[in-house]
């Protein structure tokens, strides 16, 4: 698989699965032995079922959940993406009742693409910012 093809697989996941909730595409793109190497808040398992469940929770809490991809780069089978997620908090999330607030947070993640399927994920999301926007923790005062 070429670098461009690997990037296209990851972009398709971001746009069609995360951004549109198309879980048929999820089934097509994710390897049966997928492993998420980054613990996700909420106790999701580190496998394909856990990733699908996380995506569904996010789309339920933020029905207009989508990402703006700022850039992607690949070294072969690993694709790194920097993106900003956005959405409107219209469903329960982290035990917080819907607030109607528009949220956004940045994420950098790496997905390994093997035989045209996403097989691994590592990532860092700015969940501190998300928690502040949902008033789970107080915003820092400006000096």
Feature locations, PLM:
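C-terminal and inter-domain tail/linker signature
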Residues: 1-143
């Amino acid at each position: 698989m070429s670098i461009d093809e690997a990037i296209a697989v990851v972009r398709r996941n971001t746009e069609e699965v995360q951004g549109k909730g198309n879980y048929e595409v999820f089934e097509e793109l994710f390897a049966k032995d997928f492993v998420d190497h980054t613990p996700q808040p909420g106790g999701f398992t580190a496998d394909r079922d856990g990733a699908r469940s996380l995506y569904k929770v996010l789309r339920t809490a933020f029905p207009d959940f989508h990402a703006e991809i700022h850039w992607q780069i690949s070294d072969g089978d690993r694709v790194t993406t920097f993106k900003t997620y956005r959405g409107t908090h219209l469903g329960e999330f982290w035990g917080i009742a819907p607030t109607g607030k528009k949220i956004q947070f940045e994420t950098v993640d790496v997905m390994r693409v093997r035989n045209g399927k996403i097989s691994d994920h590592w990532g860092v999301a700015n969940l501190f910012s998300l928690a502040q926007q949902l008033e789970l923790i107080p915003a820092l005062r400006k000096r």
